[in-house]
């Protein structure tokens, strides 16, 4: 299993849900499902934060290698530390900014699973050229609220090449964790909280 860093650059409050395997469980399960069908060699993580998905993708032998982009220097350091701690540093390439150029030049951009979580930057990142270049990869985009562009407009960008499945965050249950039965309701709720201000939505893009 993956060893988590004691000091987390991003989402310190998410540590309990990560330990229990509940953090963004919808996405963990989806990546597993995609790989069962396709067995892509490369995982591309755009907005890697502290490396939970990037490092986990190769620790669990789901992918041969990972390319992770994180704009924050502290974040890149956290990913590197986590990769070293988990003995997978040679399988992970850590880069700073993801843009149309840096992504389109990647060898496996069209043969990978792409996970994107960049706090609203997704609307600018996914240009017509990038969408063409990444086909027929699978992509998972975390959708953030943005008043400058409608979701319908954003969806239209992909429709020629990709089918879109919308995934909505599901309620978490701790009933299977006997070690938490003596925790009060408030503490149990905090353990599974991901601190979101609204119910999260992700889009899974699969090639037509």
Per-region residue spans from a language model:
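Conserved Class I S-adenosyl-L-methionine
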Residues: 158-168
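Structured helix-beta-strand junction loops
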Residues: 37, 135, 160-161
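Short, flexible/disordered intra-domain loops and linkers
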Residues: 148-153, 175-179
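S-adenosyl-L-methionine
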Residues: 1-73, 77-82, 86-91, 104-109, ...
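Active-site segment flanking the S-adenosylmethionine/decSAM binding pocket
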Residues: 42, 46-50, 93-152
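Glycine-rich, phosphate-binding/catalytic loops in enzymes
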Residues: 60, 85, 130-134, 157
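Conserved RNase H-like, two-metal-ion catalytic cores of nucleic-acid enzymes
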Residues: 140, 154, 158, 171-172
């Amino acid at each position: 299993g993956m060893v988590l860093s004691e000091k987390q650059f991003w989402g310190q409050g998410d540590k309990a849900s990560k330990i229990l395997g509940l953090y963004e469980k919808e996405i963990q399960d989806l990546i597993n499902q995609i790989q069962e069908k396709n067995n892509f060699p490369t995982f591309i993580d755009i907005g890697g934060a502290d490396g939970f998905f990037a490092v986990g993708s190769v620790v669990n032998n789901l992918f041969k290698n990972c390319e992770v982009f994180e704009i924050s220097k502290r974040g890149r350091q956290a990913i590197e530390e986590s990769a070293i701690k988990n003995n997978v540093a040679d399988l992970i390439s850590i880069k700073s900014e993801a843009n149309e150029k840096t992504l389109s030049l990647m060898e496996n951009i069209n043969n990978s699973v792409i996970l994107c979580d960049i706090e609203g930057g997704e609307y600018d990142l996914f240009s017509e050229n990038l969408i063409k270049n990444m086909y027929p990869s699978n992509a998972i985009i975390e959708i953030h609220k943005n008043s400058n562009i409608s979701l319908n407009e954003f969806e239209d960008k992909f429709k020629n090449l990709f089918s879109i499945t919308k995934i909505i965050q599901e309620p978490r249950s701790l009933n299977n964790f006997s070690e938490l039965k003596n925790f009060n309701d408030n503490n149990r709720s905090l353990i599974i909280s991901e601190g979101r201000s609204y119910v999260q939505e992700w889009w899974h893009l699969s090639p037509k």
